[in-house]
């Protein structure tokens, strides 16, 4: 039986490229090599596409994907050279230029099926401010927030923010994930510095009320018919779950399934599925919630390309539902092909 080609794109231009490499290495080891041939391409910080490795069988645990230190620049290709008839692309890319609709649009121009949400839902979900406004409009609870746009009067924004919110306050670049560029502010001075830091990552900044809450996550899978997982909980050994805690210090553990009341489980799964459909989602997403001590649920964000590392919540949530990592990848490939066929049929 001939194998289907699975094209892995990893690296990328965003500050989350290191997470992308970790995710892609986990995917390449989880693939069912009886069914797939894996071809990998590294995208540099400058946006160059480099042909790297090919795997016809499971690589050893010691084998690593080629990155900046090991790539061969002689293998630089035109981005369109990744095209292969019948192949499916897994863009294991996080953050801007990865899960913001950019690469999705490129793959649609190439007429290649790809895993993940489409151009519209990727771009909306990537922007925290736009996502909050969409979810507010359909009645899904949001933590109180204000917005700062680069070039506006910063002092006026601080006055407005302190009139509406109380410390602690979290400041986030609108278009960034993996907690990159996020700060916790306890004073006006810290708030100003946090906004200035966020502006180094994006021109639009979300300023959000801090809440004492548990962090609960729900996995989503599907196209027209969406399935959700039982929720899992991120249990922190630190006050603030930032990039360092997530990916460097490993100062988190996970409880899967989360120990929450059944009514809360039902509410979260319903909100997750409704939000996914409202944003035009397809393929997959991870929906992140806050759960306060008094039982208030807030939907924090939808992550359209969640981490796929061996310790990432998304694959572990599905494993808890009985869907093993290799089978999850196969399901994602099937969904990608289904959406490709649907898009193509609408262009005729």
UniProtKB/Swiss-Prot annotation:
Kindly state which reaction or reactions the protein catalyses: 2 D-alanine + ATP = D-alanyl-D-alanine + ADP + phosphate + H(+)
- Give the CC-aspect GO terms: cytosol
Which SUPFAM superfamilies does its entry note? Glutathione synthetase ATP-binding domain-like (SSF56059), PreATP-grasp domain (SSF52440)
Please list the residues that bind Mg(2+) 1: 288, 301
How does the cofactor bind to this protein, according to its record? Binds 2 magnesium or manganese ions per subunit.
Q: InterPro entries, from UniProt?
A: ATP-grasp, ATP_grasp_subdomain_1, D-Ala_lig_Van_CS, D_ala_D_ala, Dala_Dala_lig_C, Dala_Dala_lig_N, PreATP-grasp_dom_sf
Q: Where in the cell is it found?
A: Cytoplasm
The record's EC number reads 6.3.2.4
A Pfam match is: Dala_Dala_lig_N
Question: Which GO BP terms sit in this record?
Answer: cell wall organization; peptidoglycan biosynthetic process; regulation of cell shape
Q: Which residues form the ATP-grasp domain?
A: 132-334
Q: Which cofactor does it need?
A: Mg(2+); Mn(2+)
Record: residues binding Mg(2+) 2: 301, 303
**Record-stated family:** Belongs to the D-alanine--D-alanine ligase family.
Q: Tell me, what does this protein do in biology? A: Cell wall formation.
Q: What is this protein called?
A: D-alanine--D-alanine ligase
What taxonomic classification does the UniProt entry list for its organism?
Bacteria, Bacillati, Bacillota, Bacilli, Lactobacillales
